A protein has these predicted regions:
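Lectin-like carbohydrate-binding module/patch detector with strong preference for beta-trefoil
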Residues: 57-191
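Eukaryotic intrinsically disordered and solvent-exposed regulatory patches
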Residues: 18-20, 96, 146, 264
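Aromatic-lined substrate-binding rim segments of carbohydrate-active enzymes
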Residues: 220-270
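Structural signal for hydrophobic/aromatic residues that build the beta-strand cores
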Residues: 34, 76, 119, 159, ...
Length: 270
């Protein structure tokens, strides 16, 4: 079946604007299109304010960080980029000293090394990067004072540096910010992932639903479609995420509702 003569399409998903009765058959001889990015797929560079309310918003899922001991002034380093021992012995940070955050909550994180293994605690309290699938032993509470961190295991013990540059988890008391052996300075190397996953994971399910519902309702409206039509725009590209196929209950942490908004776009285009 061929496309009808229209005044506007949506493609990729593709939306079609219904022409007025006065439109001629030549109205659709040339496609004039715009992209409605940042609406049903979040793009932080388009609307960064969406992320403003996230606690520890500079530590979103996927952020790359480096950790430097305040006490010995050396960086935490996974030997070989991961898969083995971890020491606090490097004067200059590079890829072996860079860890990708997996965000569990606003204060719980997992640290993934360059080769894909996670920081983990062994039975002798030594930290290594040897686990491929993170669990409780790879999950750390972060206590933060600007760029300074205390890193705590679920059992209450804190990570520290020993005098021989070992990275251990046997600091049992509450460290102060002047305690250099259990205090680390965090440098954010890359924080460029600002999509639906980071937003929903950062806010949590309840607040993320509220934020995205308001955004989807107000970012693009029927008035915008009317303006496009009046401006002789006859095609609109609306990016959608793969999780729309599972609407209204997409896998966590994604928030349902984008399919309803896409349906509205087709209705507005009639």
């Amino acid at each position: 079946m061929g496309l009808p003569h229209t005044t506007v399409l949506i493609f990729g998903l593709l939306c079609v604007f219904q022409p007025s009765h006065s439109s001629s058959d030549n109205d659709f001889t040339k496609v004039r299109a715009v992209n409605l990015g940042g609406w049903l797929v979040v793009e932080g560079w388009i609307k960064p304010a969406l992320f403003d309310g996230i606690p520890n918003g500079d530590m979103l899922d996927g952020t790359q960080v480096q950790l430097k001991s305040v006490g010995v002034q050396k960086y935490v380093s996974a030997a070989g980029g991961g898969g083995g021992s971890v020491a606090v012995d490097q004067d200059v940070a590079s890829s072996w000293e860079t860890f990708k955050l997996w965000r569990v909550s606003d204060s719980e994180f997992q640290f993934r090394s360059l080769s894909g293994q996670f920081l983990t605690r062994s039975n002798d309290d030594v930290i290594s990067a040897t686990t491929d699938s993170p669990g409780d032993s790879e999950t750390f509470f972060i206590e933060r004072n600007n760029s300074l961190l205390h890193i705590k295991l679920l059992n209450g013990s804190y990570l520290q540096v020993t005098n021989n540059n070992q990275f251990t988890s046997n600091y049992r008391s509450q460290p102060g910010w002047g305690d250099g052996m259990a205090t680390f300075e965090m440098t954010i190397v890359a924080n460029y992932l600002h999509g639906d996953y980071q937003l929903a994971n950062g806010y949590g399910p309840v607040q993320a639903k509220s934020v995205l519902t308001e955004h989807r309702k107000s970012f693009v409206t029927v008035k915008d479609f009317h303006l496009l039509s009046q401006s002789k725009i006859n095609a609109v590209r609306i990016p959608v995420g793969w999780w729309i196929a599972y609407d209204p209950d997409p896998p966590a942490p994604f928030v349902g509702g984008s399919l309803d908004n896409l349906d509205r776009a087709f209705h507005w285009a009639q």
